[in-house]
């Protein structure tokens, strides 16, 4: 477990948010995390969105979220999951990342509000199309 922190900055591209990061945030604390696919390191000439920095801010037991800016950054090889990466690539392709307003833990988010569904978490906003989903661990 992490000590409680006001800021956690992830300095390499990952495919998913980790519970320990969320658990380690103090109330009002911020997590800055680049969610990326592997295409950001394959070709600099590609114009397809392949990574975004997100700011996740703890508000008691809730988490505000918003996309900050596109990124192409070195990947954290140990923090990559092929299924999560495919869901993230699908979410980038469908757009709507600029409407993300919350990170919700658990699986209770209706599909129409979910931009990206991870294993035990979702990035959500106003009603969107069907989410890109990461299936739960077996």
Where are these regions (language model features)?
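Short glycine-rich, flexible loops that bind phosphorylated cofactors or substrates
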Residues: 16-17, 40
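Glycine-centered, small-residue-biased loops immediately flanking beta-strands
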Residues: 29
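Helix-to-beta-strand junctions that scaffold the AdoMet/dcAdoMet cofactor pocket
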Residues: 25-26
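A short acidic, Gly/Pro-enriched loop at the edge of an enzyme's catalytic core
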Residues: 1-8, 15-16
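SAM/dcSAM-binding transferase cores
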Residues: 39-138
